[in-house]
Amino acid sequence: ETIQKILNDGGSCILMSHLGRPKKKDIKLSFKTILPQIEQILKLKLIFIENFKEEESLEKIRKIKSKEVALLENLRFHSQEQAGDEGFAKKLASLADCYVNDAFGTSHRPHASTTVIAKFFPNNKFSGYLLDQEVNAISKVLRSGKKPVLAIIGGAKVSSKITIINSILQRADDVIIGGGMAFTFIKALGGQIGNSIFEKEFLDEAK
């Protein structure tokens, strides 16, 4: 919906995202494998950018016309993405006039393509329709004043959610922790988790 709005208004889009947790370039996690599905959903041919840092790719991006869409290769093929590298984020920012974040589920991560890149668009950063819906739904509950408030939080890592959890604890009456990160809390409380993975460095905080 967000992409379609931009295209309908005569703009062009450069899509960037990630897939999996590759330590290096992995063909199985390349966006080439999902390119046909994205083109089918959007009903248009995408311009695939293998490496946005190469001059040949930059030239392709410069030539993008109104109502065209480019897709950058999996950003996690670059170690600077998850490191939140400012130089990397600035390079990404240089590709576009505006920044639109439509990924609520990853907005909490201090990565180059989410938190860091926004700093380079002081007056031209926006939220997409999906992100707006998520924020409005949460805000509606918090503003209603109705009690009790139950928050359900899932995810794999406590480390990437601890700030959010601490914030929610100030607003919710009860919190249910699910997903992989639940094992860290169970372990911290003396429970048995077998061979399940947990984050040892967060055991004290999880208590």
Enumerate the language-model features and the residues they cover.
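Active-site loop-to-helix "anion-binding N-cap" substructures in soluble metabolic enzymes
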Residues: 1-207
